[in-house]
Curated annotation (Swiss-Prot):
This is Small ribosomal subunit protein uS4c. Signal peptide: none annotated. CDD domains: S4. Belongs to the universal ribosomal protein uS4 family. The keyword Transmembrane helix does not apply. One of its GO terms (cellular component) is chloroplast. Part of the 30S ribosomal subunit. Contacts protein S5. The interaction surface between S4 and S5 is involved in control of translational fidelity. It comes from Trimezia steyermarkii (Steyermark's trimezia). GO terms for molecular function: rRNA binding; structural constituent of ribosome.
Length: 194
């Protein structure tokens, strides 16, 4: 993990750790001239590690985004941001995306009153995300909410920390994506692979 954040920069979905301020400069000095391929590859890896996806999963999302209307890069980010594990992370109900994935896999999360145990479940506007009515589930979420660094909540989400309830208001806007990334380079990377 730490090698990844040292090489790629801050990945809030993977870990709350940040690279040291001088490590960026050392990396650039050591690496010399970066080729266009390497720049595209690093952007793709940043996206992959932040959202915790395998190469195959990311490729699937790129294909879906390519077939959809609108900018492929923007649609790709919307698809990734609207995953249930990512929404839990952005709501502050989990400290990292892998932590959110574990909550979903262990059946602690309900979407619109139904248990969902698929982390890649695509949330839609007006979805209500709550915890199971069990004490253990509520304690887990309560600890995460209490320890979460109260960053500004994106405008497409609303949370009620007392009822352990989150609401998806709308599909995310590009400016609220929690990662500094050039998604066009990721799309370019895959378009050159085929």
């Amino acid at each position: 993990r730490f090698k990844k954040i040292r090489r790629l920069g801050a990945l809030p979905g993977l870990t709350s750790k940040r690279p040291r301020s001088g490590s960026d400069l050392k990396n650039q000095l050591r690496s010399g001239k970066r080729s266009q391929y390497r720049i595209r590859l690093e952007e793709k890896q940043k996206l992959r590690f932040h959202y915790g996806l395998t190469e195959r999963q990311l490729l699937k999302y790129v294909h879906i985004a390519g077939k959809a209307k609108g900018s492929t890069g923007r649609v790709l980010l919307q698809l990734l941001e609207m995953r249930l594990d990512n929404i839990l992370f952005r709501l502050g109900m989990a400290s990292t995306i892998p932590g959110a994935r574990q909550l979903v896999n262990h059946r602690h999360i309900l979407v619109n009153g139904r248990i969902v145990d698929i982390p890649s479940y695509r949330c839609k506007p007006q979805d209500i995300i709550t915890t199971k009515d069990k004490e253990r589930s509520k304690v887990l979420i309560q600890n995460y909410i209490a320890s979460s660094s109260h960053e500004e909540l994106p405008n497409h989400l609303t949370i009620d920390p007392l009822q352990y309830k989150g609401l998806v208001n709308q599909i995310i806007d590009r400016k609220w994506v929690g990662l500094k990334i050039n998604e066009l380079l990721v799309v370019e990377y895959y378009s050159r692979q085929t």
